[in-house]
């Protein structure tokens, strides 16, 4: 038997609705309502889209008919001129392929050469040496300008001092 403390615990209840399979009712999963017809918006949608769909279907039929007639007229010409057309098409295709492949090989060669030169430049460190050389030159130029500024200042000071000594 169940004890008293088990009776006070809340229980969870799961509800599973059951649907009828005869589909005559208005509710439930998969139920269809046979008593009412299509809505007004559905009727308007069908009436609007029916002429558009029919027109597109007619255009597709005309395109198919034109294609079949064109093939019927062109097939004898293709058969008669095939000894000339097939080799000409093959020659044109080979020429186009040759131009495209030569361009691709040229680009591949240029990119490979660029890659190798960049790798050699980084391996020998010429880029780092160039940067160090540029830094050293800027530093030397700064020192030179500072030295010249001091010399010019001393010359001006000496001339000013000579001018004062000559007056007295």
From Swiss-Prot:
Taxonomy, superkingdom: Eukaryota
InterPro entries: Oleosin (IPR000136)
Region named Polar: 2-45
CC per GO annotation: membrane; monolayer-surrounded lipid storage body
Residue list for modification N-acetylalanine: 2
Assigned keywords, A-Z: Acetylation, Lipid droplet, Membrane, Transmembrane, Transmembrane helix
GO process terms (BP): lipid storage; response to freezing; seed oilbody biogenesis
Annotated spans, Hydrophobic: 46-117
Pfam family name, one: Oleosin
Primary localization: other
Topology term for the membrane: Multi-pass membrane protein
Residues spanning the membrane: 43-63, 76-96, 97-117
Subcellular location: Lipid droplet; Membrane
Function: May have a structural role to stabilize the lipid body during desiccation of the seed by preventing coalescence of the oil. Probably interacts with both lipid and phospholipid moieties of lipid bodies. May also provide recognition signals for specific lipase anchorage in lipolysis during seedling growth.
Family according to the record: Belongs to the oleosin family.
UniProt-recorded name of the protein: Oleosin 18.2 kDa
Species assigned in the record: Gossypium hirsutum
């Amino acid at each position: 038997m169940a004890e008293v403390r088990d009776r006070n615990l809340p229980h969870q209840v799961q509800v599973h609705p059951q649907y009828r399979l005869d589909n005559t009712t208005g509710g439930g999963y998969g139920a269809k309502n046979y008593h009412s017809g299509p809505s007004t918006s559905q009727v308007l949608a069908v009436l609007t889209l029916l002429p558009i769909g029919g027109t597109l279907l007619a255009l597709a039929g005309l395109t198919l008919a034109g294609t079949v007639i064109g093939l019927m007229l062109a097939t004898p010409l293709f058969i008669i001129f095939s000894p000339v057309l097939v080799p000409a098409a093959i020659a044109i295709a080979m020429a186009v392929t040759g131009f495209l492949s030569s361009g691709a090989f040229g680009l591949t060669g240029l990119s490979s050469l660029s890659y190798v030169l960049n790798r050699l430049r980084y391996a020998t460190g010429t880029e780092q040496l160039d940067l160090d050389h540029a830094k050293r030159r800027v530093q030397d130029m700064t020192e030179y300008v500072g030295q010249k500024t001091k010399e010019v200042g001393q010359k001006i000071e000496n001339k000013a001092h000579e001018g004062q000594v000559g007056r007295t």
